[in-house]
Amino acid sequence: MSTAEPAEARIEDADTIMVAPSALRDHDVVRDFFGSVITPEDFASGATDLARKTVYLCGDLSGSGTGGRRLDAAARVFVVRELSHGYDEDAGGRWDLIGLGRVPLRVHGVGVYYRRFFEPGADHFGRISAEHAFQSLTESDKPATAHRSGIYLTPVTRHGDELHFRLLRCSTNLSGPTEDFGPTDTRIVEALNREAATVFRNHAPLNHVLAQIYHNTLATEGRKQSKAKISAHADKTKDMPAHGIMAFCTFYDRLDGLRPLAEDAFDFGVKGASGLTRLHFRLKEPSAQHDGGAPPAQFTLTLHPGSVFLMPLSTNRLYTHAIRPSPLDAESLPTRLGYVVRCLSAEAVHKNGRTFLKTAGDPAPLEQPTPAGMDELRRLYAEENRTSSFIDYGDRFPFSMNTGDYLAPAVHDLG
């Protein structure tokens, strides 16, 4: 481990404002809003600086008290459909109309959650599945194939016979190569980067995806059902910059067997029981401190369709996270596509049939792992699961556990 603590991305809400009447102050979206909340009267006073800020409008928008030209100084203005009235979008409205799920919610100061950042009707599950051939995978030193399929995705550029891309050399071993972004990936990651710019300071851009389809196996005679899950772990940051961030996106297939729950319109289930997957966080060290305070020992997010959870790597340093299935039977569950977007600093070039790591000097060939190297890397991986300290991987590991990293990345050539 390194005793030096590199600068991390920080969550910053100073540029996000909600205008909401006092009557809405107990609404969960207003109460948990990521940013400052002011009343229409405060807003009308002109005391709030709107320059380059994101503004969410609620309440009566029919009068002149909604800001007029003052809102032109804002970077973005959203009208929250369910919490507003009097806004006539068809009459040349210049602000974007959004649903409750698109409003950012604060999660204990360690992340920001959007319950429906992407509209389920856009069928991201189908689009992503059509643009890529998902691969079988194993984890770390486990010989069995996991109950999910996946693929690494990142922009791939061709320079003559060379293919340039980014590597995530973690313990997930895929049967095929990294693939270039498809059109849907590009749109998703561009939207996430735009949003991240309003949530974080000093952060690296999102540029890499691990997409995984979580398969549930029905019970048969002589075989128990199996529901997709992943045990508690921290992401391995060997190929990530310290100021990186992460975006957990969720898309579902086969939601038609579930219905919206009365107590949460974004949740889907049967007879009051949720059929959706949960993302559970637990502190690695109970005494950990964050921004001078004590973060919660644990918390859980329901992964709603089209949801996004944004967090800095400091949250990954403090917490492990686990994927937990619904208590419903496997036959009732939808199929989930977990679409995790990260920031990678490791760059590579594939040429002459080999993958090379880009370094300060000449590119270095990606070597085959040695038993000693694998043992040391696994030791550090286990340590990153246990400690909230920074893990310094250095440049001691010129190999990958993922056999796909030794293959030429697949490129979406145009024409």
Task: Place the predicted regions along the sequence by residue.
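Non-heme Fe(II) oxygenase metal-center motifs and adjacent flexible, charged/small-residue loops
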Residues: 2-415
